[in-house]
């Protein structure tokens, strides 16, 4: 998608440099190219549409309060604005489909306040830095994405779940307490929202407003251990995966990979490429119980790694990281985000839909989710297979579109007020 009309970019640059300084605006061609892509190329369907848009300028505010200043100028001049954290989204969330201004929040990284049970930080704060800061007070983030290099704003606006979702659900399930957002109505000020009023901004790709600052929930910090186990067959591995739901206190993350995926993961003595791998982040006091469960159910514990590094190693092999590593080994694979009982109850039927299917599973709060990876031939093949999977009871979230699909009604309810000119990340909502 390209911009049809000529945008008043020069005028916008002058205004922003006057208010934010010369260094706030970047026109360097290499920087513009980098700011116009994310990880959408993991989808062969989206990859065929790339490049899908190019930034005309990148603006990097230094604080949350500078973000609405940028949006006021963009509103007055009619220039599209696409927010960007570290660009780690998988669905084209950060691609400026209509060109215009990419708003890079990476310098807005101040941890404003740590309280008992909450932390307030600017949108560009890296989650690793945020978690380290709150751990000094004996607390931790209850959920975070599999990549801790993500920003707080990027995770809230572009992400959904991750490590901790097994216990706490997604980032829309009470994780967010308050938001300060910049809307594109010409007002030039931050808008403060709390509780359920934050939901139209969570996983909305910045289409309803750009998150400038957030207060999120904390829990007490616990001692976690990363447990790596190996299994001879799919049934025993999935039985163990599901049985970990009974462990109290609950594990934080439980992931399963079939052997073909394990063989594509970075080499590690804790991973046996000839067997299925089930990995878990468990409370340290439950380690002995988990070891007994593995022995009783016919598996083998290959390693237990204590401390933050051990747990983060398990997290770094969860969710879409399995897709990344498999595609790195064999670029001919595509993936679907899947969920439902057939993933463990009828795996042969699931595998029969596409050639060379392999499964990565995640134990979630209410069901088993995962990634189905298979040999790609065409968009039609993918869509026909999706219909077959849905007919057998598998629910699907497609990573092959950059339009928003979740909680659309809540998003649309605030659009007329928050973005009357349709300038916030245009192209990410169905017409």
Language-model-detected regions and their locations in the chain:
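N-terminal flexible segment immediately upstream of the FAD-binding catalytic core
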Residues: 1-72, 88-117, 261-267, 308-329, ...
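General beta-strand structural signal in soluble alpha/beta enzymes
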Residues: 25-29, 60-61, 81-85, 103-105, ...
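Short amphipathic alpha-helices in soluble, non-transmembrane regions
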Residues: 16, 74, 240-246, 286-299, ...
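Helix N-cap motif at beta-to-alpha junctions
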Residues: 233-236, 281-288, 339-343, 374-379
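A conserved active-site cap/scaffold subdomain adjacent to cofactor or substrate pockets
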Residues: 223, 240-303
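Conserved glycine-rich FAD pyrophosphate-binding loop
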Residues: 4, 84-86, 93-100, 106, ...
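FAD-binding subdomain of flavoenzyme oxidoreductases
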Residues: 112, 127-128, 132-247
């Amino acid at each position: 998608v390209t911009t049809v009309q000529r945008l008043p970019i020069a005028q916008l640059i002058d205004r922003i440099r006057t208010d934010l300084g010369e260094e706030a605006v970047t026109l360097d061609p290499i920087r513009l190219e980098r700011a116009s892509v994310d990880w959408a190329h993991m989808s062969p369907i989206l990859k065929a549409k790339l490049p899908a848009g190019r930034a005309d300028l990148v603006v990097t505010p230094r604080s949350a309060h500078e973000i609405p200043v940028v949006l006021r100028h963009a509103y007055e001049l009619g220039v599209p604005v696409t927010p960007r954290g570290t660009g780690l989204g998988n669905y084209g969330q950060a691609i400026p489909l209509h060109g215009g201004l990419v708003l890079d929040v990476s310098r807005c990284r101040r941890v404003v306040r740590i309280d008992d049970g909450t932390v307030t930080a600017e949108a560009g704060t890296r989650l690793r830095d945020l978690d380290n800061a709150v751990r000094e007070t004996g607390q931790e983030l209850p959920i975070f994405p599999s990549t801790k290099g993500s920003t707080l704003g990027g995770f809230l606006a572009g992400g959904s779940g991750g490590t901790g979702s097994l216990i706490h659900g997604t980032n829309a399930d009470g994780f967010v307490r308050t938001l300060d957002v910049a809307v594109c109505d010409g007002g030039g000020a931050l808008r403060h929202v709390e509780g359920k009023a934050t939901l139209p901004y969570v996983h909305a790709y910045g289409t309803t407003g750009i998150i400038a600052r957030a207060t999120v929930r904390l829990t007490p910090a616990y001692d976690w251990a990363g447990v790596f186990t190996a299994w001879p067959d799919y049934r025993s591995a999935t039985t163990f995966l599901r049985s970990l739901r009974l462990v109290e206190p609950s594990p934080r993350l439980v992931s399963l990979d079939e052997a073909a995926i394990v063989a594509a993961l970075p080499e590690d003595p804790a991973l046996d490429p000839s067997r299925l791998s089930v990995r878990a982040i468990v409370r340290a006091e439950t380690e002995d119980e988990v070891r007994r469960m593995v022995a009783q159910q016919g598996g083998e514990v290959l390693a237990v790694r204590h401390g933050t590094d051990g747990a983060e190693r398990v997290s770094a092999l969860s969710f879409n990281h399995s897709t990344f590593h498999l595609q790195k080994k064999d670029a001919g694979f595509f993936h679907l985000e899947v969920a439902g009982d057939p993933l463990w109850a009828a795996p042969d039927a699931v595998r029969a839909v596409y050639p060379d299917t392999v499964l990565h599973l995640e134990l979630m709060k209410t069901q088993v989710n995962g990634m189905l990876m298979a040999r790609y031939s065409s968009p039609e093949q993918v869509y026909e297979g999706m219909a077959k999977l849905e007919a057998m009871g598998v629910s699907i979230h497609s990573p092959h579109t950059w339009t928003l699909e979740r909680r659309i009604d809540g998003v649309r309810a605030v659009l007329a007020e928050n973005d009357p000119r349709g300038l916030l990340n245009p192209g990410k909502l169905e017409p």
